[in-house]
Amino acid sequence: MLPDKKIQVDFNAPDLSSNGGLVLVGLMKESIARKVARLIPDHRNQLFVQHSYEEMVCQRVGQIMCGYEDANDCDRLRHDSALKMSVGRKASDPDLCSQPTMTRLENHLDKKTLWAIAELFVKDYMSSFDKAPRKIILDVDDTNANTYGAQQLSLFNDYYDEYCYMPMVIFDGMNGKLILPLLRPGRRNKSLNIFGILRRVIEFIHKEWPHTMIELRGDSHFCSHEFMDWTRTHLYVKFTTGLSGNPVLMKKIDKQLRRAKGDFERHHADVRRYYSFEYKAKSWTYKQRVIAKIEVTDKGVNIRFIVTSNRNNKPETVYRRYCKRGTMELWIKDLKYFRADRMSCSSFKANMFRLFLYGAAYVTAYRLKSKAFSNTEVEVFTMDSFMKRIMLSAVFITEKKTFVRFSFSPHHRHLEAISQALTSLSA
C-alpha cells in the first residue's frame, strides 16, 4: 500500500459507529417500532427489568435497518452508541439487551398480540394520509421465504422446489407504502383464505374511510369468487386480478387469435390486441367481465387474461392499469433487502413477529426517504442503496455534560441530503 511506511491496524478508535443512519431514526418523533412495542403485554416483574420492550423492539428494528437481521447480532451491537441513542439511551448508559433476551421476546407473543400488531400496520398506513384519499389500490402478492429447519407450518412448495413460508404482502399500489405483511404457510393461498383476509382489511379501512374507493389488484392466485361475489354488495370495492387460462377461455378468443396471427403474417410486424367478453366459471355465482390480451411476435404467441369489475373503460385501458402492479415486485425486493425472508425461529408465531419487525424496518425507511429526504436523490434510492449509503454511515459520537455531538465525515457522498434530513427531523 505504502512502500516506504509500515502499516498498523487496531480496533481502538474512540466512540465511532458504522451505523450513523440510526441517528436519523432516533430523531423520528413517533416510529412504528415504538407503537408495536406498546402493544406487547409485559408480565415481567418490573423491579428486575433492565430492558423495556420499547427499547428492545427499537433495537431490533434498528439493527434490521442496518442489515443485521439475526438476533445473534445483538451480542455485538448492544454496545454501539448510535444504536443506544436511537432507542433513547445515552452512549454512557448500560448496554442494550443480548441475544437470549431478544429471543425470549420473539417467542413471547400470543395470537391476540399478533392480531393487534397486524391492525396497527393498517392504522399506521392510514395515519400517513392527511385526509381520506378518494381511491387506493391494494396490490397483493405472496412471495417465498425459504426455510431450512423444522419450522412450524413450513411446507414443501413445488413451484419453488423448496420448503418455505409464503408471506402475503399488501402494498398501496399508488405509492409503495406497505399496508400489511402477513406470514402464511408454505402453500398457495386458497380462494376462501384470500377472501377472509382481504375482507377484514377492507372493512377495517372503510370504518375510517367509508367513501374511499378500494380496488384490489393481484395475479391469478388472488382471483377469489367469494371476493367477487362480496363486491357486488359493496359499492366502494372493485377488483382487477389475473385469470388462469383454460380451454373455454381460449375458445372465446379463437376468432380474434386467428385474425391476429393473420395480420402478423401479412405485415411482419408485432401485433397486440385487447378483447373483452363475459365469462362465468363453474364455481362463480355471476358472470364477470374478462379481458384478453393477444400478442403475436416473432417469438411466438402470448395470451393473458384478467377479470375485472371495471365495466366502464376500454379493454386496453383496464389491462394497462393492471400491468402497473408489476412495480410491486420491486417493493417486495425492497422488503427482502431487509432479509424479510429470514425465518429462523422454530415457532410460527415467532416468525410472524419477525416478519412484522422486517415490515416495521421497511415502513421506517420509507418514511425517512419520502419525508426527511424529500426532493433529494436519496428519496428514490432502493432500500439496498439506502441501507448501504445512509444507514451504514460512519459517525463519531461525543457525549458531554449538556450535549451530545454526532460528527459525520465531511467527505460523505450524501452530506447535503443528510444535512437536510437532520434539519427536517429536528424541526
Where are these regions (language model features)?
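Short, glycine-/Ser/Thr-/acidic-enriched flexible segments
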Residues: 143-145, 185-186, 244-246, 297, ...
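An anionic, glycine-rich sequence signature occurring as long contiguous blocks
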Residues: 1-7, 11-14, 238-336, 395, ...
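Short amphipathic alpha-helical "interface-anchor" segments enriched in bulky aromatics
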Residues: 28, 74, 314-348, 353, ...
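Short, surface-exposed basic-aromatic patches at helix termini and helix-loop junctions that form
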Residues: 228-237
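A short acidic (Asp/Glu
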Residues: 149, 224-229, 250-254
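Dynamic "connector" segments at or just before major functional cores
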Residues: 1-189, 193-208, 233, 369, ...
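Basic, amphipathic alpha-helical segments enriched in Lys/Arg and hydrophobic/aromatic residues
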Residues: 341-403
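Acidic/histidine-rich, metal-coordinating catalytic segments
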Residues: 141, 212-222
